[in-house]
């Protein structure tokens, strides 16, 4: 309830043009008929005169209205809000006229439509009430019996006498507040003995109970002492004269209200078609006025409340007649004049029937007045009061306790069924039902949204005529649809940028740990291609990538026993072993499991001889890269599976391609590095790259061991294997029904099945003339800069570069290399000694071109 604006009319006079005088003794506010504009201080003194100077912390809202932080809106302003709504003003107009925030207007009107009450909800009203009437009476009894009793003693006594339980016992602060309220009531009883008033010669007994925090509740005279007076006037708060105005005269109120309604007419371009300017004499008169005067002066010294009624109107004053006499108000609301008392001017009823009463006082006053024989002046029956109390959820057990300081008054806006029906009609009139769209409408809207996110008014009108919706609803739909699209786009961007932190292996050696971010802007260039189809194997030969030299696949095992020289001869078939045990053949620890460079595509060696893989027990540091999730964004697929827990090694690349970058790869097999035109740098030259990679997604295998290592086919001693041939290398792999795709870029073999044979779960290497491929899925190898240097890649002992021969002139960039590779892969026809025919994927070249010639996703 913070920053709720109080009544702030646009520079008009205060309530009745009062020049308020707040004082510590809360003396009566002197009425003034001056029509001069009030200042802010006097306005505050009028509206919030029950607050002390320390409590009146004012502010100005964006509309220019003033408010007191933490205090509810005054009842007079609430009443004006409801009146303007009944007159047909929109909430935004009401907000501008009264200079009250739009949210406050909407909340007050919504509560009024639902419950018929304009009262604010209790502060902390969601909490259960504990200071009930029974508890308050007990506290009062204990205090009378022992005036020096403490609050905690009262609390203990309430528990001992089973008045309360531990669940609903009031706190010490609540008990102290009740005691303060009781003391204020006692003081009020002693000082306000002559302040009660009557009307039409009928003496009315009433007692005003005043709380310290501004809570005033009217207690029936039958319960406590009688304060009677047959001569004083009884003040009441009509819809335009609430208790905040005190005993103010209404002589200046007509001009103020006329100014408000003139604003409303100007906003709605409707000028008053009914009566002319309203005289101040037609303002809602105070009940109990003598026939010869309208401006009355209150002699009550304790009009101390800003939210509730200070005194109860005995004759139920109806809505002021002048507000329903013009063209503003719906014709369904009839105007039936009723006469209340001999000396009271006739007023018009707000709705059909004489039983409407818009009193804002608590219902127990009306009940008590009815119980002492004044029903003739009160058109509301007691059963109607009880019914309305049930409807409003009013709890009258807070009498004098201060707990119900802002509770809804059950008797407020008590009316008959016609009033309820009129309010429901207003609710249906002012509140629009939520729009339900049909499937055809949604389809049309979505098609238009695909065309443009911001259709102009002509497009919206055309669409409105097509699908039968108002243009305003279409505009709102597009606004909501754009918000939904922005949310989805944000999620898509988050998916494109995964967590770059992975479980990096904890190594005891001097291994440098590098971190990669698998984003399109920060990965190394890794040209990748799917060359195999599900139907049969395909064998590709890289003709344009290297000079007549061997393509070697260096396969690193957990421990490399001896160098294997594979020159012009078939190589052993390496099995994939899904374990990372420490085979201490040459004193090498299980750390070698982490040193396995995985098959970022097959390295092309421009070396005329073969490569030697030697494991002589050297311990050279390898850059370990934490696990990341490589992705491949295919044209038609959206692969989201990731390998997020695999350890990747960093491979060093030649500086001839601009930068030496770590490349994400899986520890399934190791592939030799690409031969650049210049000598390969050493391992220390690892720098980040800005080249774009192909993002590849992998469906996780059914069994995901920590590392896969390749060992010789017979399962004997571990050894590295090199695949090589004089002209080309034909490398294939079979999934043997393992159930996941094999991607060419990573040369990723499937995990072995339990009963698979060596031929089913191995790489099959061929010489230059044949391609021995086990038919199911194939792995096509491709060039990729392999950043492992010659001195540190798998512990290669020789120090010379792999090749100084330049790549063929036709290959000027990665795109050309890839294109030549795709062309050669599509056009070659390998000679198959085993009789298996090569099958090339038809969309391979298209995919490859989309990777390198289309914008990266």
From Swiss-Prot:
Tissue specificity of this protein: Expression is confined to the eye imaginal disks, parts of the brain, the ventral ganglion and the salivary glands.
Ranges of compositional bias, category Low complexity: 241-257, 308-317, 404-416, 500-519
One GO cellular component term noted in the UniProt record for this chain: nucleus
Biological process annotations from GO: adult walking behavior; brain development; brain morphogenesis; central complex development; compound eye development; compound eye morphogenesis; eye-antennal disc morphogenesis; glial cell migration
Keywords per UniProt: Developmental protein, DNA-binding, Homeobox, Nucleus, Paired box, Transcription, Transcription regulation
Region annotation RED subdomain: where it falls in the sequence: 134-182
Top-rank taxon, per record: Eukaryota
Region of interest: Disordered: 236-257, 271-322, 392-417, 488-519, 554-588
Gene Ontology terms, MF aspect: DNA-binding transcription factor activity, RNA polymerase II-specific; RNA polymerase II cis-regulatory region sequence-specific DNA binding; RNA polymerase II transcription regulatory region sequence-specific DNA binding; sequence-specific DNA binding
Database matches in Pfam families: Homeodomain (PF00046), PAX (PF00292)
DNA-binding region: 56-182, 430-489
Annotated localization: Nucleus
PAI subdomain, as annotated region: 59-115
Biased composition annotated in UniProt, kind: Polar residues: 289-301
PANTHER family given in the database record: PAIRED BOX PROTEIN PAX-6-RELATED, PAIRED BOX PROTEIN PAX-6-RELATED-RELATED
Protein family per UniProt: Belongs to the paired homeobox family.
Purpose of the protein: Involved in eye morphogenesis.
Protein name: Paired box protein Pax-6
Species of provenance: Drosophila melanogaster
Source lineage: Eukaryota, Metazoa, Ecdysozoa, Arthropoda, Hexapoda
């Amino acid at each position: 309830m913070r920053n709720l604006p109080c009544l702030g009319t646009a520079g008009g006079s205060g309530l009745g043009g009062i020049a308020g005088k707040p004082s510590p003794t809360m003396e009566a506010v002197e009425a003034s008929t001056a029509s001069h504009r009030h200042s802010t201080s006097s306005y505050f003194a009028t509206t919030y005169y029950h607050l002390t100077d320390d409590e009146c912390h004012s502010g100005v809202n964006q509309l220019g209205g003033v408010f007191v932080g933490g205090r509810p809106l005054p009842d007079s302003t609430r009443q004006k809000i409801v009146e303007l709504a009944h007159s047909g003003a929109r909430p935004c107009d009401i907000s501008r006229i009264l200079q009250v925030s739009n949210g406050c207007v909407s909340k007050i009107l919504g509560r009024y439509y639902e419950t018929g009450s304009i009262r604010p909800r209790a502060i902390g009203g969601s909490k259960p009430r504990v200071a009930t009437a029974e508890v308050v009476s007990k506290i009062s009894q204990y205090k009378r019996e022992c005036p020096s009793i403490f609050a905690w003693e009262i609390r203990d006594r309430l528990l001992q006498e089973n008045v309360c339980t531990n669940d609903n016992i009031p706190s010490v602060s609540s008990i102290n507040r009740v005691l303060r309220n009781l003391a204020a009531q006692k003081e009020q009883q002693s000082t306000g003995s002559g302040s009660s008033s009557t009307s039409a010669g009928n003496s009315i007994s009433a007692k005003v109970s005043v709380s310290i925090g501004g809570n005033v509740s009217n207690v029936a005279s039958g319960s406590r002492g009688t304060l009677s007076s047959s001569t004083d006037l009884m003040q009441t708060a009509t819809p335009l004269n609430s208790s905040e105005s005190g005993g103010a005269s209404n002589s200046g109120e007509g001009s103020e209200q006329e100014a408000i309604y003139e604003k409303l007419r100007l906003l709605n371009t409707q000028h008053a078609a009914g009566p002319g300017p309203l005289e101040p004499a037609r303002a809602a008169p105070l009940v109990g006025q003598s026939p010869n005067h309208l401006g009355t002066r209150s002699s009550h010294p304790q009009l101390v409340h800003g939210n509730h009624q200070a005194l109860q109107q005995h004759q139920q004053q109806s809505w002021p007649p002048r507000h329903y006499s013009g063209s503003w108000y719906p014709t369904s609301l009839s105007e039936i004049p009723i006469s209340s008392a001999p000396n009271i001017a006739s007023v018009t009823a707000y709705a059909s029937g004489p039983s409407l009463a818009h009193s804002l006082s608590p219902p127990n006053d009306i009940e008590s007045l009815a119980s002492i024989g004044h029903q003739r002046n009160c058109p509301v029956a007691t059963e109607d009061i009880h019914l309305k109390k049930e409807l409003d959820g009013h709890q009258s057990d807070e009498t004098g306790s201060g707990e119900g300081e802002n509770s809804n008054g059950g008797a407020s806006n008590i009316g008959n069924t016609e009033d309820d029906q009129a309010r429901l009609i207003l609710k249906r009139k002012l509140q629009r039902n939520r729009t339900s769209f049909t499937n055809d409408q949604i389809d049309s809207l979505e098609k238009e949204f695909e065309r443009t996110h911001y259709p102009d008014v002509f497009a919206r009108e055309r669409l409105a005529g097509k699908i039968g919706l108002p243009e305003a609803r279409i505009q709102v739909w597009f606004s909501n649809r754009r918000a939904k699209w922005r949310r989805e786009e944000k999620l898509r961007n988050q998916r494109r940028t995964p967590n770059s932190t992975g479980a990096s292996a904890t190594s005891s050696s001097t291994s440098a740990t590098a971190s990669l971010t698998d984003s399109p802007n920060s990965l190394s260039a890794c040209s990748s291609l799917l060359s195999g189809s599900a139907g049969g194997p395909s064998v590709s030969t890289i003709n344009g990538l290297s000079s007549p030299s061997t393509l070697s696949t260096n396969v690193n095992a957990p421990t490399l026993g001896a160098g294997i020289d594979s020159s012009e001869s078939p190589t052993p078939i390496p099995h994939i072993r899904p374990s990372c045990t420490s085979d201490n053949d040459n004193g090498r620890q299980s750390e070698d499991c982490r040193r396995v460079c995985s098959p970022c595509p097959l390295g092309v060696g421009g070396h005329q001889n073969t490569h030697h893989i030697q494991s002589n027990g050297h311990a050279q540091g390898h850059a370990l890269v934490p696990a990341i999730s490589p992705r491949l964004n295919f044209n038609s697929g959206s692969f989201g599976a990731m390998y997020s827990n695999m350890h990747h090694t960093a491979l060093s690349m030649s500086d001839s391609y601009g930068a030496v970058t770590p490349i994400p790869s899986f520890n399934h097999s190791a592939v030799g590095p690409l031969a650049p035109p210049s000598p390969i740098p050493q391992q220390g030259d690892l720098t980040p790259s800005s080249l774009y990679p192909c993002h590849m997604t992998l469906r996780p295998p059914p069994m995901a061991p920590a590392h896969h290592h390749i060992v010789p086919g017979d399962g004997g001693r571990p050894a590295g294997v090199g695949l090589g041939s004089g002209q080309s290398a034909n490398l294939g792999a079979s999934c043997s029904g393992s159930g996941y795709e094999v991607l060419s870029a990573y040369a990723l073999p499937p995990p072995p099945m339990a009963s698979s044979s060596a031929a089913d779960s191995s790489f099959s290497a061929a010489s230059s003339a044949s391609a021995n491929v086990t038919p199911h899925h194939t792995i096509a190898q491709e060039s990729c800069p392999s950043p492992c240097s010659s001195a540190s890649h798998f512990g290669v002992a020789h120090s010379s570069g792999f090749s100084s021969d330049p790549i063929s002139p036709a290959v000027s960039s990665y795109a050309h290399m890839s294109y030549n590779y795709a062309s050669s892969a599509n056009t070659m026809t390998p000679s198959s000694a085993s009789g298996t025919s090569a099958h090339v994927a038809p969309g391979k070249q298209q995919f490859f071109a989309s990777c390198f010639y289309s914008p990266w996703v």
